[in-house]
From Swiss-Prot:
It comes from Brucella melitensis biotype 2 (strain ATCC 23457). It comes from the Bacteria. Belongs to the IspG family. InterPro entries: Dihydropteroate_synth-like_sf (IPR011005), IspG_bac (IPR016425), IspG_bac-typ (IPR004588), NO2/SO3_Rdtase_4Fe4S_sf (IPR045854). Pathway: Isoprenoid biosynthesis; isopentenyl diphosphate biosynthesis via DXP pathway; isopentenyl diphosphate from 1-deoxy-D-xylulose 5-phosphate: step 5/6. GO terms for biological process: isopentenyl diphosphate biosynthetic process, methylerythritol 4-phosphate pathway; terpenoid biosynthetic process. Converts 2C-methyl-D-erythritol 2,4-cyclodiphosphate (ME-2,4cPP) into 1-hydroxy-2-methyl-2-(E)-butenyl 4-diphosphate. The keyword Repeat does not apply. Its cofactor is [4Fe-4S] cluster. GO terms for molecular function: 4 iron, 4 sulfur cluster binding; 4-hydroxy-3-methylbut-2-en-1-yl diphosphate synthase activity (ferredoxin); 4-hydroxy-3-methylbut-2-enyl-diphosphate synthase activity (flavodoxin); iron ion binding. It catalyses: (2E)-4-hydroxy-3-methylbut-2-enyl diphosphate + oxidized [flavodoxin] + H2O + 2 H(+) = 2-C-methyl-D-erythritol 2,4-cyclic diphosphate + reduced [flavodoxin]. This is 4-hydroxy-3-methylbut-2-en-1-yl diphosphate synthase (flavodoxin). Its EC number is 1.17.7.3.
Length: 420
């Protein structure tokens, strides 16, 4: 596994050198930053709801969005979705997620084949027995015809059973057989690599192929992607399938992908969270961004540092202020990205008492140290490491919010450009 040193923040890390793939103009792999992507859960045939969700995911920061293409009505809707998104200013690459009949849908709906930026193929259900290679080849040939990349996405829940049985039988005949888990991992890796080799034999370039091998257990994911990284230089899409809901899904995905990313493995990621009923689908985008930003690999939104609180901070003022600023940042980022280039590098500190408050506030671009329990009701504010004022009275929170807004305007806004 070859590597090079890449620095996206101030933290260099060894990056596995993969072959870059252009997905609708977004580069995945090579020396490009790790890309964040997501997937809709709407009925793709419902153009209005799908456009609305893709737009929301794109506004949240998803750089690629995958949609289900499972029947004729879905395939027929794809060009309409693409056109509507472009009219709304959302030029985000759309990936078609195909299972079972992808070869037929792409052939019957050429406008869909053209509108999509990438095709996702699952080797485990692209076809069965004597039809398998033919139907796989049909999709690959369609990708060649329309000059589209493909993701060969193996999933342990739909693993090629013929390949798995062959490897299990071969393993059983060995003198010191491997565990069933090890054989399954090998089958997943082989399924991806065999399919990639077949695609290349058909004529698809390596710069048009992305691989993924999704499982639902953290240790399996780490093992499988480590094997893939050692045995190929294809661009890799990371994702823990069926990660689950809430904190469990966030922790499991972050644990697995954090380890792989730290080793330089992974060119694009998706955090597959099960949303709560009526929940916000954009949550998975936010978690993916926060994972990459927390690890120091990319910058997406200003960082808000806040202390966890203790017996010195019985007041909730600092918690409420930190939450307000964080929500304000998330809400305004789509506009700020255009209006204030570089604002994602901003750091804000909202601290709750005198112990660590002043020190942490000095390290941030702009920070405030609110009074803890029994402390003088005043709050020193630090800008670029220097104390600039002390806020007092019931309007401390509102005053600091205005100072943050002014700082952003002065540092990243038009006035700064004119002055320079």
């Amino acid at each position: 596994m070859s590597s090079e040193t890449v620095s996206y923040f101030s933290h260099p890390f060894p990056r596995r050198q993969s072959v870059g793939v252009s997905v609708g103009g977004v580069i995945v792999g090579g020396s490009a930053p790790v890309v964040v992507q997501s997937m809709t859960n709407t009925d793709t045939a419902d153009v209005d709801s799908t456009v609305a969700q893709v737009a929301a995911l794109h506004r949240a920061g998803s750089e690629i969005v995958r949609i289900t293409v499972d029947r004729d009505e879905s395939a027929a809707a794809v060009p309409k979705i693409r056109e509507r998104l472009e009219r709304l200013g959302h030029d985000v690459p759309l990936v078609g997620d195909f299972h079972y009949i992808g070869h037929k849908l792409l052939a019957d709906h050429p406008a869909c084949a053209e509108a999509l930026a990438k095709y996702r193929i699952n080797p485990g259900n692209v076809g069965f027995k004597d039809k398998k290679d033919k139907q796989f080849a049909d999709i690959v040939e369609m990708a060649i015809r329309y000059d589209k990349p493909v993701r060969i996405g193996v999933n342990w829940g739909s693993l090629d059973q013929e390949l798995l049985t062959t490897l299990m039988d071969r393993n059983q005949a060995e003198g010191a057989p491997l565990s069933a888990q090890d054989v399954m991992r090998e089958a997943i890796v082989q399924s991806a690599l065999i399919s990639a080799n077949l695609a290349e034999e058909i004529g698809l370039g390596r710069d048009k192929i992305i691989l993924s091998a999704k499982v639902s257990q953290v240790q399996d994911l780490i093992a499988v992607y480590t094997m893939l990284a050692q045995r190929s230089n294809h661009a890799l899409h990371l994702g823990l399938t069926e990660a689950g809901m809430g904190t469990k899904g966030i922790v499991a995905s972050s644990a697995a992908m954090g380890i792989l990313l730290q080793q330089g493995i992974g060119d694009t990621i998706r955090i597959s969270l099960t949303p709560e009923p009526g929940g916000d689908r954009t949550r998975e985008v936010q978690v993916a961004q926060e994972l990459l930003q927390t690890m120091g690999f990319r910058q997406f939104v200003p960082i808000v540092a806040a202390c966890p609180g203790c017996g010195r901070t019985t007041s909730t003022v600092f918690q409420e202020l930190a939450q307000t600023i964080q929500e304000d940042i998330r809400r305004n980022m789509p506009l700020w990205r255009e209006k204030y280039p570089g604002v994602e590098a901003l750091s804000v500190a909202v601290m709750g008492c005198i112990v660590n408050g002043p020190g942490e506030s000095k390290h941030a671009d702009i920070g405030i140290s609110l009074p803890g329990t029994g402390e003088t009701p005043s709050a020193p504010v630090f800008v670029d490491g220097k104390k600039v004022t002390t806020l007092r009275g019931p309007g401390i929170a509102e005053d600091f919010q205005k100072m943050v807004a002014d700082y952003i305007e002065n540092r990243f806004g038009l006035g700064r450009k004119i002055a320079s």
